[in-house]
């Protein structure tokens, strides 16, 4: 009788695991969760994309936005997250100049100058990446923007204006690539 109960329990457990949804998105073999919880705020996946640079695969990305927020408000003061998984090694010191260039393309000069201390702090947090490493930026209103590498927090930069500027690199009016922005926004 015990054996029959064990078999029945095993069958129920196995049936339950096969019925569970996968809750993820995959692009180029890289898997991203369909949601993320940050400071008790649920962020939903809006889209995933592949960024090519000079014809080479640079990285894949996923963008998460606070549930209930409009996709047109991605740069507003709302919780959001971007994850980028790299296909190539990049030196930490090389992230700063690229970040400066892309922020400057998306904000006016007075705004860039006002944000310079936050941008410099952000750029100082970057470390070398190798293929398979994943950077994330998570913005929580009132808290700031956290940069993490492979899930390990590197630092927190305060300010909704900084968050809008740094997320504009991928989602602003002059992003890294329009096609990548559109993929991240599910368009």
Give residue ranges: language-model regions.
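Bacterial N-terminal signal peptides
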Residues: 7-17
């Amino acid at each position: 009788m015990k054996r029959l109960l064990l078999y029945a329990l095993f069958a129920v457990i196995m049936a339950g695991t096969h019925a569970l949804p996968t809750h993820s998105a995959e692009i180029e073999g890289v898997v991203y969760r369909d949601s993320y919880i940050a400071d008790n705020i649920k962020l939903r996946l809006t889209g995933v994309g592949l960024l090519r640079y000079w014809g080479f695969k640079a990285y894949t990305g996923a963008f998460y936005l606070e549930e209930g927020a409009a996709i047109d408000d991605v740069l507003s003061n709302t919780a959001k997250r971007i994850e980028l998984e790299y296909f190539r090694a990049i030196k930490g010191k090389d992230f700063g100049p690229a970040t400066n260039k892309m922020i400057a393309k998306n904000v006016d000069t007075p705004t860039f100058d006002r944000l310079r201390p936050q941008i410099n702090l952000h750029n100082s947090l970057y470390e070398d990446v190798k293929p398979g490493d994943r950077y994330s930026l998570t913005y929580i209103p009132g808290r700031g923007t956290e940069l993490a590498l492979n899930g390990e927090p590197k630092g927190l930069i305060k300010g909704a204006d900084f968050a809008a500027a740094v997320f504009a690199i991928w989602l602003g009016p002059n992003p890294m690539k329009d096609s990548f922005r559109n993929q991240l926004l599910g368009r």
